[in-house]
């Protein structure tokens, strides 16, 4: 009888294998940080490959980077920094039970993320039209050298993988909007929104490293 009463007193968001909400929160946060570390390791390998190739052929990397549109890259940097602000405001709004404001901030984050992807689409299509493709598909006459093709292979791999993470982040944020509308997140339970925010901040930070490494080679 006592156990049944205790079960009824548990909040609906508390999973059965946790003692209380605090334990669930700490476990979820720890798990999220472990996941983020694996993401950093994955991108870290690509950064190492970039550094090695650039150290071997600095002049060619410099010339190849000139084919990238710095203005579009800078615009996307501003867009993602703004999205970091809106997702942070969304988390704070949920903590204060300002659910409508949180939904608006999350929607703004999705719009900014979509803007990032649209800009990246135009950037990619411009490269494709010139024959600047990864690997064996590289046919651009402006820089006729194998290492230029390697630079763009790294460029597409790093920015493409980052773009996939942006799309995943958009999906997660939309899911959080749905949960917020259903009342599933609030001041007493905002772990999913906070973890989504952590993922989104990582996506932003990775781009902040990618932008100078790829677009601002000197």
Q: For each predicted feature, which ranges?
A:
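...captures the hydrophobic TM-helix bundle architecture rather than a specific catalytic motif
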Residues: 1-218
């Amino acid at each position: 009888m006592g156990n049944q009463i205790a079960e009824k007193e548990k909040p609906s968001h508390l999973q059965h294998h946790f003692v209380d909400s605090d334990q669930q929160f700490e476990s979820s946060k720890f798990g999220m940080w472990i996941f983020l570390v694996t993401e950093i390791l994955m991108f870290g390998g690509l950064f190492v490959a970039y550094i090695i190739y650039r150290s071997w052929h600095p002049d060619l990397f410099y010339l190849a980077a000139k084919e990238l549109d710095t203005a579009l890259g800078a615009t996307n940097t501003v867009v993602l920094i703004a999205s970091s602000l809106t997702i942070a405001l969304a988390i704070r709004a949920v903590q204060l039970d300002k659910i409508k404001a949180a939904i608006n901030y999350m929607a703004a984050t999705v719009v900014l993320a979509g803007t990032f992807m649209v800009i990246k689409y135009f950037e990619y299509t411009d490269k494709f039209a010139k024959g600047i493709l990864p690997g064996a598909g590289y046919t651009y006459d402006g820089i006729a050298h194998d290492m230029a093709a390697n630079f763009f292979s790294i460029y597409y791999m790093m920015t493409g993988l980052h773009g996939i993470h942006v799309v995943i982040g958009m999906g997660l944020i939309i899911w959080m909007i749905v949960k917020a509308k259903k009342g599933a997140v609030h001041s007493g339970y905002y772990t999913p929104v906070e973890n989504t925010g952590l993922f989104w901040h990582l996506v932003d930070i990775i781009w902040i490293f990618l932008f100078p490494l790829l677009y601002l080679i000197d």
